Structure formats: C-alpha cells, structure tokens
Amino acid sequence: GATLASESGKRGLRIGHLETESGSVLSGYIKDKTGNDAFYMVGGDNQDANLAGRIMPMGGTNLNVKVGLVKEGTGTYRITANNNLVTGGLRILNGAVMVNNDLEKTEQEKLTGGIGHLANNASEAGVYVMTKGILGGIGSVGTTTDVYGTVAPGDGGIGTLTIKDFTGSAQPGLTLHPKAKIRMEVTDRDHHDQLTVGGLLALDNRMEDFT
C-alpha cells in the first residue's frame, strides 16, 4: 500500500476527502525525526470515508512525533486498523468517527487499537468530541476521551465501544461535559449498546471553549 507523509516542521494538511486501504500508512514527517509534527484535517467534502490503513509516526516507533487527525464536515469516517498510533490525538469537530477495529484481535494480541495513545504516553485526553461531533463504533480507543458532543456505541446496530489500552499502559478514562450525550440503542434488556471504560469516568462542568 501507499504511504502519505509530510515535510519537516509542524504541518497542518487539509484534505477534503481521504480514503486509505489496508496495507497503506498515514504518517507524519517522512524522516522520523522528533519535533516534526503533522495534523491532517479531513472530511470537508461532507462525504463518508474509510481509513483502513495504519495511522502512525514514520517507522511506527518514535512516539515523540505527533500524527493527529481533525474531523470536519458532516460525513462519517470509519477507522478499522488494529494497531494505530494517533500520537497527536483526534478531534471531532463535526460529523462522526466510527472506531471499528477488531476488538477481539486487538485484545488478544495486545495491540493499540483504532486510536492508540498520545506521544510519550501522555496522560491528557487524546480524543476530543466537540459539540457537533459524534464518536461511535465497535472497536477500541486507547486514550482518555473528552466529550462535549455525543458518544454513540455501535455502528448501524447493537455494539460495544471500548475505551481501554490493551498494551498495558495506564488505563484511559472518559470525561463528560455539561452538554455531552451518550446515545444507546436498546432492543430489550439483553440486547443493547454498551460503553466500556477501562479508567475513570469523570464529570466536568466546563463548557466547550475551543474548536
């Protein structure tokens, strides 16, 4: 598969529509050197897309390099790779991001999952769901998640979204702000969406103060 990388320095790259296939890589600075960060803003064309390739710093080992995603537009992006390292975090400004990696494989093989953790395993939130954003899916998020918008486990049906790091690092938590919503599909008492959090669940009274 192909590799999409950036030049040196701190870069912001805006791509209206981005699709990646399994075997491809969405990366940062092409030379794997600390201090060169890349943030991809995607989804501006308001269409759905799949990110099936890996998302990680060049080489996949230098956790000091940030590779981040910013989701704009009203479409839905689906992330399906099992061993991503979105070291610069994910911000969902609008539309939806479905994290749909294979949860069983991720847990059994102790992989990083659909999102992974931040550069240097930083403890602050790595996923921000803004007021107009939705986070859903049936996979795993390996970093603390801060929600001003909506968390909706599943993707077109009953499912479980897991916020947990299977690599053995400190467990991520979930922070809900005043206007945050958790949207569940319930058929009956035995068939319903679930949200699993490996770390702490926190309530924070701060309103959205940035986008």
Regions found by a protein language model. Give the residues of each.
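Conserved Rossmann-like nucleotide-binding pocket used by diverse enzymes
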Residues: 14
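Extracellular beta-strand/loop-rich repeat segments of large surface/secreted proteins
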Residues: 9-11, 130-211
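Aromatic/basic micro-patches that form nucleic-acid/chromatin recognition or nuclease catalytic surfaces
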Residues: 4-6
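Extracellular repeat-rich scaffold modules on cell surfaces
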Residues: 1, 19-130, 140
